[in-house]
């Protein structure tokens, strides 16, 4: 699928113009240009990316450990609930992308980030009070992960592309996406274990942590949208 997409979709007009102007062949290393000229863009991108890594690792990774160790659910049932949520998420990713094209990438991403941060509270509450019901456990994971997280994941790549000009876009997006990715992936599950031990098995501290990440990402996404709109207005073609 990736090969088909890559060979059938043309480069953007912006990139083709940069290539024709010789900007893509300049000798300055793109990573030097990005770090020197776009530090705020990098910070905003990393801030926006935070909820992606945090929320996924809490709901799709740590929740399995929580269900098995704290609620004594079988590992098979916990994995089944997460796999069901991941499968259900696919059409909602497409819907989120469509909504982002219509209403603005930053708006949809920011609202979805806030929804993720808020939904984690009832999600863990429902897991705690499920009584071992697979239906309730599946519901507790599927709604936040399949619907709200899809609103983050769907417009994410397009949102980050708004941060950098064509000549350094690939490098800029790589920094924004990969740097917080490997940090969060390694830290969040262990941090959640520590937080839940501190609170004697209660996931409230974890929910607060997710909410802080969500607020940070929402602020960053709304700021990216506002900056993009100002730049588009200055160019005479605002894109809401």
Question: Can you describe what each PLM-predicted range is?
Answer:
Residues 114-131:
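C-terminal ends and interior cores of transmembrane alpha-helices
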Residues 2-7, 159, 211-240:
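Multi-pass alpha-helical transporter architecture, strongest
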Residues 194-212:
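A membrane-interface helix-boundary motif in multi-pass transporters
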Residues 93-105:
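Helix-to-loop junctions at the C-terminal end of transmembrane segments
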Residues 7-30, 233-237:
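Flexible cytoplasmic inter-helical loops of multi-pass small-molecule transporters
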């Amino acid at each position: 699928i990736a090969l088909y997409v890559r060979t059938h979709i043309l480069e953007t007009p912006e990139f083709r113009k940069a290539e024709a102007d010789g900007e893509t062949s300049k000798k300055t290393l793109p990573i030097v240009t990005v770090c020197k000229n776009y530090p705020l863009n990098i910070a905003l991108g990393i801030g926006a990316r935070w909820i992606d890594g945090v929320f996924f690792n809490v709901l799709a990774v740590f929740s399995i450990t929580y269900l098995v160790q704290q609620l004594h659910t079988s590992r098979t049932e916990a994995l089944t609930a997460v796999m069901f949520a991941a499968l259900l998420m696919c059409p909602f990713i497409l819907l989120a992308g469509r909504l982002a094209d219509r209403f603005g990438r930053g708006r949809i991403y920011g609202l979805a980030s806030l929804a993720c941060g808020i939904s984690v509270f009832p999600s863990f509450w429902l897991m705690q009070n499920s009584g071992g019901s697979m239906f309730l456990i599946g519901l507790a994971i599927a709604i936040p992960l399949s619907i709200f997280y899809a609103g983050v994941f769907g417009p994410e790549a397009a949102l980050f592309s708004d941060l950098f000009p064509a000549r350094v876009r690939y490098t800029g997006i790589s920094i924004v996406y990969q740097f917080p990715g490997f940090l969060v992936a390694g830290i969040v599950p262990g941090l959640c274990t520590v937080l839940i031990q501190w609170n004697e098995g209660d996931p409230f501290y974890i929910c607060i942590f997710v909410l802080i990440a969500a607020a940070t990402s929402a602020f960053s996404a709304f700021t990216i949208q506002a900056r993009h709109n100002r730049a588009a207005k200055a160019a005479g073609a605002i894109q809401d």
